[in-house]
């Protein structure tokens, strides 16, 4: 029997069996251990979840703002109390190092929930005077039942990023985690119930995106879909959502983000930033700065600093607190990353380090890929143009500011970008020209609860986090009041 046994669906405040009996396995990518057998939701199960959510949403929306706020803040407290327990489960399910999951995944997810819990009482409309005898007032009302579809790289954080603004605005959410990493979303559902969330307001349906995800995007009882994942899948989700019942959508999709290092930059700081922008979470971060642009005159120096830092990476068992680089999320994803690495080798890029699966000793049981750095890369190479979502850095040289801005923008993606320079005038000038939704100056990767995040171009639609996201989980009702006489033309 697997370590965590059979995992059921979470509907109407309790675990329930799927109606069709289909299951899939949760696998620890560090060693291939089957962690759990997880039930897959059927169309009938999704119908149950939607009916439950519709009923629960009416109860939730009727509660006072302060009452809703207190319940979500109670959930924040429980998340923080159980941080280490949840982090340990996230590490087993994703392969991410415990040093990361204990410090980031649950912590930042709880921060977002706390942020939106505090904003609930501030959701208000406007009063617009028309004349002495008439005025208009507006109400921000919830959409109703919304769906969240998560990615596998930050399972519980994404579940919180999606559910926090949705619930804060008075909606109910049906959440489908990635079938690769489903375990912590189910724990989050338990926590919401324990905190006092009415039954049905947060349901979890597990299963594949192709089946369960499509049930959600097609369902007429769902008003909005928020999706995190790849561009190809995102386009299908958006088409299904709009083609079925004209649902609203939020899409947080892929990226191939440029990190531009200028000639006046502190090269040590630049190298530190490049390392974090490529190898944190074993390179499985959508905002990673995988196209590293370096002045041609500084390329050799920069490469030496990167190699020096790669040697300091502590690849190992992700449950070891000393490890800071674990396996990839699955064996299938490892094969995808290795195919990109072979493409890099065959395209003429110069391999500085890595470029292979790690198979020494116990590592042979896991989905480990060595931190990989290519240099002398060209813009047309596949490793430079396509999102790899793994520990693969591409170094490109350039001659002028104008050139590097043009090349940085020469992509269908537009999720993130960054510059490293001591010249703040140049920093702002360049950032204002970069076609990306999230930009960093002399840093990389932080996405605070208050900061709207999302992409330009094919990297997404809409934003997550920040004030504006809360607005997109509501709809405006305008009401005109006439206090004076009414004159008919008939």
From Swiss-Prot:
Q: Provide the positions where the record notes the PTM Cysteine sulfenic acid (-SOH).
A: 286
**EC number assigned by the record:** 1.2.1.8
**UniProt-annotated catalytic positions:** 162 (charge relay system), 252 (proton acceptor), 286 (nucleophile), 464 (charge relay system)
The UniProt record gives the binding positions of NAD(+) as 150-152, 176-179, 230-233, 254, 286, 387
Main enzyme class: oxidoreductase
User: What InterPro entries does this protein's entry cite?
Assistant: Ald_DH/histidinol_DH, Ald_DH_C, Ald_DH_CS_CYS, Ald_DH_CS_GLU, Ald_DH_N, Aldehyde_DH_dom, BADH
Q: Where is this site: Seems to be a necessary countercharge to the potassium cations?
A: 248
Which prosthetic group or cofactor does it need? Answer: K(+)
The pathway noted for it is: Amine and polyamine biosynthesis; betaine biosynthesis via choline pathway; betaine from betaine aldehyde: step 1/1
Q: Which UniProt keywords apply?
A: Metal-binding, NAD, NADP, Oxidation, Oxidoreductase, Potassium
| Chemical reaction(s) catalysed | betaine aldehyde + NAD(+) + H2O = glycine betaine + NADH + 2 H(+)
PROSITE patterns per the UniProt record, alphabetical: ALDEHYDE_DEHYDR_CYS, ALDEHYDE_DEHYDR_GLU
One Pfam family matching this protein: Aldedh
- Where K(+) 1 binds, per the record, is at 93, 180
Highest rank taxon of the organism: Bacteria
Textual note on the cofactor: Binds 2 potassium ions per subunit.
The membrane-spanning stretches of this chain are: none
| Protein residues bound to K(+) 2 | 246, 457, 460
Instruction: Give any single GO term for biological process.
Output: glycine betaine biosynthetic process from choline
Q: Which GO-annotated molecular functions does the record name? A: betaine-aldehyde dehydrogenase (NAD+) activity; metal ion binding
**What is annotated about its quaternary structure and interactions?**
Dimer of dimers.
Tell me the function of this protein. Answer: Involved in the biosynthesis of the osmoprotectant glycine betaine. Catalyzes the irreversible oxidation of betaine aldehyde to the corresponding acid.
* NCBIfam families referenced in this protein's UniProt entry, alphabetically: BADH, PRK13252.1
Family membership noted in the UniProt record = Belongs to the aldehyde dehydrogenase family.
Q: What is this protein called?
A: Betaine aldehyde dehydrogenase
Q: List the gene name.
A: betB
């Amino acid at each position: 029997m697997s370590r965590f046994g059979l995992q059921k669906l979470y509907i109407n405040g309790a675990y329930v069996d799927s109606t069709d009996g289909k299951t899939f396995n949760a696998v620890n990518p560090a060693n291939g251990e089957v962690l759990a057998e997880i039930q897959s939701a059927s169309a009938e199960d999704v119908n149950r979840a939607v009916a439950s959510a519709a009923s629960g949403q009416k109860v939730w929306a009727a509660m006072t703002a302060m009452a809703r706020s207190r319940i979500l803040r109670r959930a924040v407290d429980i998340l923080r109390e159980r941080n280490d327990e949840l982090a340990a489960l996230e590490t087993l399910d994703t392969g991410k190092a415990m040093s990361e999951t204990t410090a980031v995944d649950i912590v930042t997810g709880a921060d977002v929930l706390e942020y939106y819990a505090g904003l609930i009482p501030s959701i208000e409309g406007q009063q617009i005077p028309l004349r002495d005898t008439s005025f208009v007032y507006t109400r921000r009302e919830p959409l109703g039942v919304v769906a969240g579809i998560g990615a596998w790289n930050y399972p519980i954080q994404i579940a919180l990023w999606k559910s926090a603004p949705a619930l804060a605005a008075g909606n109910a959410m049906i959440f489908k985690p990635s079938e690769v990493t489903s375990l912590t979303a189910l724990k989050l559902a338990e926590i919401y119930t324990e905190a006092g969330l009415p039954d049905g307001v947060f349901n979890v349906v597990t299963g594949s995106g192709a089946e369960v995800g499509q049930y959600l995007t097609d369902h007429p009882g769902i008003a909005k879909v928020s999706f995190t994942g790849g561009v190809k899948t995102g386009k299908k989700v958006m088409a299904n959502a709009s083609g079925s019942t004209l649902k609203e959508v939020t899409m947080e999709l892929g990226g191939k983000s440029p990190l531009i290092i200028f000639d006046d930059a502190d090269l040590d700081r630049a190298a530190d930033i490049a390392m974090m922008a490529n190898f944190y979470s074993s390179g499985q971060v959508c905002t990673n700065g995988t196209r590293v642009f370096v002045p041609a005159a500084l390329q050799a120096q920069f490469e030496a600093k990167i190699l020096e830092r790669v040697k300091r990476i502590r690849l190992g068992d992700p449950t070891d607190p000393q490890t800071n680089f674990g396996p990839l999320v699955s064996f299938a994803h490892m094969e995808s990353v290795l195919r990109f690495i072979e493409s890099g080798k065959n395209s003429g890029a110069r391999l500085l380090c890595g470029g292979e699966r790690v198979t020494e000793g116990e590592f042979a049981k896991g989905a480990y890929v060595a931190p990989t750095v290519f240099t002398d890369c060209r813009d047309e190479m596949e490793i430079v143009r396509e999102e790899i979502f793994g520990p693969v850095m591409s170094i490109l040289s350039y001659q002028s500011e104008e050139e590097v801005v043009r090349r940085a923008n020469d992509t269908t993606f537009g999720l993130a970008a960054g510059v490293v320079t001591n010249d703040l005038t140049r920093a702002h000038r360049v950032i204002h020209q970069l076609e990306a939704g999230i930009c960093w100056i002399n840093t990389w990767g932080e996405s605070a609860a208050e900061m709207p995040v999302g992409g330009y171009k094919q990297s997404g639609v809409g934003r997550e986090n920040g004030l504006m996201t809360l607005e997109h989980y509501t709809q405006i009702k305008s009401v005109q009041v006439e206090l004076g006489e009414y004159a008919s033309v008939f």
